[in-house]
Amino acid sequence: SGQALLIAGDSGVGKSTLLDVLAGELAPLQGRLRLNGRDFADFLPSDEVGYLAQQVDIFDLTLAENLRLGKAGADDDALWQVLEKVRLADWARAQPQGLQTRLGEYGAAVSGGQARRIALARLLLKPRALLLLDEPFAGLDAATREAVSAMLLQERAQGLLIVVSHQPPAQADFQVLRLQEKA
């Protein structure tokens, strides 16, 4: 608990595939995954595991409705708190409709970095023992990347965080697993 792992490596070495297996999206071709002596499949599917895929889903709904897909009963205060965490609260407050801002088909009304942070906020609304994040910093400027990274490390104080990123944060609080192609 409280562990943060950064999976690094060149394109095509299997970082995202590894996360897909851990998230239960793909079955391993061989071998078994175990966590604390139990088959990893025993943990899936579960509300204890949150997965941010490389391709995020933003729906033609309001910001609030998109966020509440992560926790249906979340009140507006919880939504504003999670938007603060992912550095989107100022943007949302600047919108004429605030939380009721429509995001458009496939999130057309927001940038790629904003879409990733909305999807991340959706995951963070519900406490989870394991967060699997594929490229959570994509499309973010350096300052936002560092702020989101620091927040994730703080949030994971009681859980496990596994991140795949081509733009790793400057902080050294991640253990690093570097994947390489077979020679």
Language model: regions and residue ranges:
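The feature captures the beta-strand-to-loop junction immediately N-terminal to the Walker
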Residues: 8-10
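Helix-to-loop junction immediately C-terminal to a conserved catalytic motif
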Residues: 23
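Conserved ABC transporter NBD signature motif
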Residues: 31-45
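Conserved catalytic motifs of ABC-family nucleotide-binding domains
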Residues: 56-74, 138, 170-171
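ABC ATPase nucleotide-binding domain helical subdomain, centered on the C-loop/LSGGQ "ABC signature"
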Residues: 64-104, 150
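Hydrophobic/aromatic position at a conserved helix-loop-beta junction
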Residues: 118-126
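A short, proline-enriched helix->beta-strand linker immediately N-terminal to the Walker B motif
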Residues: 125-129, 158
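Catalytic Walker B motif of ABC-type/P-loop ATPase nucleotide-binding domains
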Residues: 131-135
